[in-house]
Every structure is written in C-alpha cells, then in structure tokens.
C-alpha cells in the first residue's frame, strides 16, 4: 500500500534538477506543492526511500554553513552580538584604532618566510659605524662567511660583478689604513682617510698576499662608506719608503674602482707629499684620466688641511702628528735670522795685543829714519 501511494505522489511532483548549471546545490524555492498534491497527509510509517513533501518539510535537506551577519551593529547573528562578545567592554571598538599591517610588517613576514632563498652566502655588511669607528668596517668578525680549520676568517664581497674572498685574519693588523672622517658640505659627502703609515712592510712575509686582500678590503670599504660625493685624504707623512705602495698596486686600485666611485670622487688631497709620491703620480699619468689628475691637490701641513675640510672626525695617527711637529720645528729653525758676531771693544782688548802693535809701529818708524 505504501509503495502504490508513493508512486501516485511521484506522478504529480514537478522534479527540478538543481545540479545542472551550478557546482553547489541550492535549496528549492518554496512553492505550493502541497496544494497541487491535494493536501497529502504525512505517513510516518513510510520507508526512508519515499519522498516526503508534507507541509513540515517543504525544502530539500542540505548542509549549509551557519549564517553570520557580517556587520558592525549588534543585531542577532552579527559579529558584535552577545553570542560572540564575552563582556560589555568588548563592545566598545573604535575602527580607527584597529591596526593594519604596514610595509615593515610585510617585509618582516617575507624575510621570515621560506619563499625567499639566498642565491649565495654573501653577507650584507651594514655601515652602522660612526665616523672614525671603522677599524673593522665589517663588524667584529662574528658574521664572517666561515672560518677554516686554521682559524682564519673570510669575507665574501662582490666587486665589479665578481665575487672575491677577503682573508680578514691576515689584514686585521692593517685595517686602520682606511677610516671614515665624517662629512663635508651639505648632504652625505663622505671624507675617506687613507693612512699610508699603516700599510705593511714590504719585507714582511706574504707581503703580496696581504696587499692583495688589503686592496679588496679598501675597495669594498669605499662601496660601503660612500653614498654620494666624497673625497679621499691621503696621509703620506711618516711613511717610510718600504711601506709605500707600488705603482702596480695603485694602478690596480684605480681600475678596480667602480665607475660611480670614480665619478663621485671630488678631490684627492695628498697631505705631506714626498718626492716619491710625486714621481709615482707623474709616471701614472698615461693610464690616469685628465679629470682624475685635475682632482689631485697637495697639502703641506695639517693646518692647511684644516682650512679645507672639517677635522672633528678625522683620526690622525700619532706618527703623522709627530711628523708634523718635526716639520714645524725644522721650519722655525731654518727661518731664524743668523746672529751677528760679537766684537770686543777697543778698551777690552788684551794688553799683549797692544804691546805687539806698538812694537811693530816703533820698528816701522826706525826703518823709515835709517833710510832717510
């Protein structure tokens, strides 16, 4: 009996396919299906396979998410209703006080994520040193690329789109050769101080290896310290001949300097120039541009240097200060006028001298008398 009744019901049911055009099912529209069925009575004894279209169940049973009213009012179902807020204090929300992520947070998120990978192990050196505190421009050595079994520290730098490794263990005693001397003018116009007295002795073992790594250190330091225009103060005083850099080393430095650094160099001040440095620059003219030669300026004293640049942050080595003092002392002695010879008065001459002159005069008179 139940099967026959279900069959009669199905003949009058308008079946609508809800799965043809959409991926997700949607509830059937509420229509008056009960009236067309003539007010069918619910049969509680019907098997689960029958289609129950009684008045109590007018829609197809679907699983849907709970409805949430995403609004800022306190209506029922809203995010600000009592169902979601625990205390009345939580209801006092100012939209202007809501913090939104900025660019810094985004960068921190990217930096901590796994999507970004280093192409190499090149560390980034930060120029946080204050002017003059550049004995080790790359830090205290704790962030080196690695250390070999013999305890050497290495630094990887990129110069001219080429990767180089610097042996910091070998050049650590000579790192004071280049320091930051502050700024001049307006903006970040840096003063780079190069003290030749801190260069290694040519008779030291591994001299060429040290100079090779020291050269890379100087070039990479310039790229770290220079932001805009800059000048180089070359302290040549108190530097013995055995510590003077060779022509080949200077030539290599010039060619390895980036074009931006060469262009932004406004002046090369050579303090206490010697005949050797003048000769080196004269020999180097064929491979040095005319513009670079025009930027060279000779300064013969620290007093003259002080009139050109601010000296607040320029660290002068003790040997350079002593050399300046010796030059000033020698200059004062050379310009001192000669003292006149002291002549004794006639009355203070010795009596023997007077007697000898009297005897000579008497002998002359006797000769004249005898001749007459």
From Swiss-Prot:
Cleaved by CASP3 and CASP7. The potential C-terminal product released by CASP3 cleavage may inhibit the ERK signaling pathway through MAP2K2. This is Caytaxin. It is linked to Defects in Atcay are the cause of jittery phenotype, which is characterized by severe truncal and limb ataxia and death due to starvation and dehydration by 3-4 weeks of age. Residues 190-372 are annotated as: Mediates interaction with GLS. Interacts with KLC1; may link mitochondria to KLC1 and regulate mitochondria localization into neuron projections. Interacts with GLS; the interaction is direct and may control GLS localization, negatively regulating its activity. Interacts with PIN1 (via WW domain); upon NGF stimulation. The interaction with PIN1 and GLS is competitive. Residues 1-58, 329-372 are annotated as: Disordered. Residues 115-120 are annotated as: Required for interaction with KLC1. Functions in the development of neural tissues, particularly the postnatal maturation of the cerebellar cortex. May play a role in neurotransmission through regulation of glutaminase/GLS, an enzyme responsible for the production in neurons of the glutamate neurotransmitter. Alternatively, may regulate the localization of mitochondria within axons and dendrites. Residues 43-53 have a biased composition (Polar residues). The modification Phosphoserine is found at residue 54. The CRAL-TRIO domain is known to bind small hydrophobic molecules. Residues 171-328 form the CRAL-TRIO domain. SUPFAM superfamilies: CRAL/TRIO domain. It comes from Mus musculus (Mouse). It is found in: Cell projection, Axon; Cell projection, Dendrite; Presynapse; Mitochondrion. Residues 11-29 have a biased composition (Basic and acidic residues). The record marks 105-106 as: Cleavage. The gene is Atcay. Gene3D superfamilies: CRAL-TRIO lipid binding domain (3.40.525.10). It holds the Pfam family CRAL_TRIO_2. Keywords: Cell projection, Cytoplasm, Mitochondrion, Neurogenesis, Phosphoprotein, Synapse, Transport, Ubl conjugation. InterPro entries: Bcl2-/adenovirus-E1B, CRAL-TRIO_dom, CRAL-TRIO_dom_sf. CDD domains: SEC14.
